[in-house]
Amino acid sequence: MHEKRRERGRTYRVGLILGFCLLIAVNGLFPVSCVYAEEEQTKIAYGENTPGQLYARSAVLMDADSGRILFAKNAETERPMASTTKIMTCILALERADPDESVSVSANAAAQPRVRLGTVEGQKFKLKDLLYSLMLESHNDTAVMLAEHLAGSVEQFADEMNQKARELGLSHTHFVTPNGLDGADDGGSHRTTAEELARIMRYCVMESPKRKEFLEITGVSSYQFSDLEQTQTYSCINHNAFLTMMEGAISGKTGFTGEAGYCYVGALKREKRTFIVALLACGWPCLLYTSPSPRDT
């Protein structure tokens, strides 16, 4: 009896994380033709109810209420994490700045690669509006604008991101960029692990004094704003498809770079508990880039 109950529990947990992966493949969160990984394909079988294959190279399912890891695959392997980085950028901005502050666009920010808001040097925006741009549309120029506003430079902001990671007890996470573009510095490459990415998300949605604001931003379907000069209006659509496709989904962030592949971190409420899933290296496009691409989503 007890063994059957444990088996059902294991199958449920793996089924939950596989549900995320299936939605990624089928419902357009990532392109269907690319959701496979070339190595480390692990067959997971628990009794008669075999959930199938989990193709993400690294994956974690966490009970966010307790911090307990319910399922793990290569959870401590360091990998680049693409735009899932932006959950750290967002929570630091919420904790360290007034949402009504004015943020100016530098030449460096305006020159960032797609995906971008499309700003020009000298424009000014309300910080709160930029957080929606950051989290809904994953704009790379917005991330740099916030980093420069909060810390004076991208490099200094990366130092502050790493300091926050250390405060959270994360020893395998290193930030180089605020937007998740592939990069490296004296501390090594831009990287995390599936477990530590899940722990960052747990902090954002469960522990941060600004968790309510974080959930509000990441939970809306769309948002519209203008620059402070009212010269242009911008519309943002939330690309976290799980908000409408999976019951109980409350927050999440997608990502992709040439080195990271497709990545995702998200939170959902199920049976009065909060769960977090982190997926790294879910796959790459079948038609690989002929040269390194800076694109991040």
In which residue ranges do the predicted regions lie?
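Bacterial N-terminal signal peptides that target proteins for export
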Residues: R6-L18
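Active-site-adjacent loops and short helices of periplasmic peptidoglycan-processing enzymes
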Residues: V35-R199, C204-P209
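Domain-terminus/edge residues, biased toward the C-terminal soluble/receptor-binding domains
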Residues: L170-S171, D185-R295
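A short, sequence-level motif marking secondary-structure junctions
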Residues: G15-G19, T77, Y132, N240-A241, ...
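Structured C-terminal helix/loop/strand segments within mature extracytoplasmic catalytic/sensor domains
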Residues: R10-R13, G28-S58, A64-F71, A75-R79, ...
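Viral structural modules
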Residues: H2-E3
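Hydrophobic core
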Residues: F20-G28
